């Protein structure tokens, strides 16, 4: 039996949730492995359009997350909740 609580993929560095009108977008950084990070962007009204981008360093993932956050704010989205 695998203990998923110890899997690297279960580790979320941070998660931000944005909203605009009646829609929400979640953008998070999570560890994919010991040396791989993912930036996950999910429009919560259509999770089938989720995007996952992989990076070899947390610094690259943080930069991408910041760029996405900037783009969302510039498009009128508001930060509603965050963790991390």
Residue ranges and their predicted role:
Residues 35-39, 59-67:
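Short, surface-exposed linear segments at secondary-structure transitions and domain or protein termini
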Residues 46-63:
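A short, exposed loop/beta-hairpin motif centered on an aromatic-Gly-Thr core
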Residues 1, 15-19:
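Basic K/R-rich, polyanion-interacting modules in nucleoproteins and related proteins
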Residues 25-51, 82:
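Short aromatic-glycine-(Arg/Gly/Cys) micro-motifs in beta-strand/loop hairpins
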Residues 20, 24-29, 62, 71-84:
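Short, mixed-charge low-complexity intrinsically disordered segments
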Residues 1-7, 83:
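Intrinsically disordered, low-complexity regions
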Residues 8-16:
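Short, hydrophobic/aromatic-rich segments at coil-to-beta transitions
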